[in-house]
Amino acid sequence: MDNTALPKPLARLRLRRGQYLDDPPADQELVHIKRLEAALPQLDETSYFARASAALIHGLPVFAADLDRVHVLHTGGSNGRISAVTHEYKTPKEPPNLTLVDGVRVTTLARTASDMMRRTLFGPSLAIADAALRLGCERAELLAEVKGGRGCRHATEAAKRADALSESPYESLVRATILQRGLPLPLLQHEFSDAWGFIGRVDFYWPRFRLVGEFDGRVKYTSLLAPGETLEDVLHRQQVRQERMEALNLSFVRWDADAVHTPGAIEASVRRYIGDGVIDHGLCPEAHDYRRPRRRAA
């Protein structure tokens, strides 16, 4: 057979020495899963996936974490190293916060969440903490993991305020903004009914102001698709749902990803209905810091 006649891949990604992925997908999380699959046979009984790698295995959001390298924790060593495809960490003795997920060695859910929360900002930390609780992590275990060390203060704030009712990372980011901007805390996943029965459940609800807040994302709507439905069908159903709620004298504010990432956008949209009052939610200064947390001087 003439191999020269075969189509050549448009792109090739190195997973590890001697192993490549042709035409890698655009989704960096999917690419990282391929990296993990390539690295798995190389791990011995003293090695565990950690940080962003463990986060993907557990189902935690990873945000802007380093997905270009596989993150591996080796027990019984003292020095780590970084290569083009791996970031290796060492610990002198085997810590208690290691586990198996579907036969794969990883840091525990609480340890993984803590590792990720410490190295990002308060908003993403809250999203990670929310997801950890939703996946079954106990709050006390998470609080124990984030205690002390780099990034502990904002991570502790996030662990204290985490809520398993938050259904998506963007809902968590909205709630983080609510806390940071001194807005009243809403009820989460509140349900509404009318004379015809159940209408639906909303992301946020402020009873005092009869105000509903919802994050709109394409992933959210595609997840609502029934067999044979189009996205337009879902959008129409959502419009009917909103009209029924508005008939209950409810007001709506909606946000997309651009609003979440635009400073002041969420606060401005809510204050149109609730006024200018500011509530001190008691966040530590680090939870108001929009810079990535850095190591403290010794």
What residue ranges belong to the model's regions?
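Short gly/ser-rich loop at a beta-strand->alpha-helix junction or flexible surface loop bordering the NTP-binding
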Residues: 1-151, 275-298
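Surface segments flanking catalytic/ligand-binding clefts of nucleic-acid enzymes
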Residues: 133-298
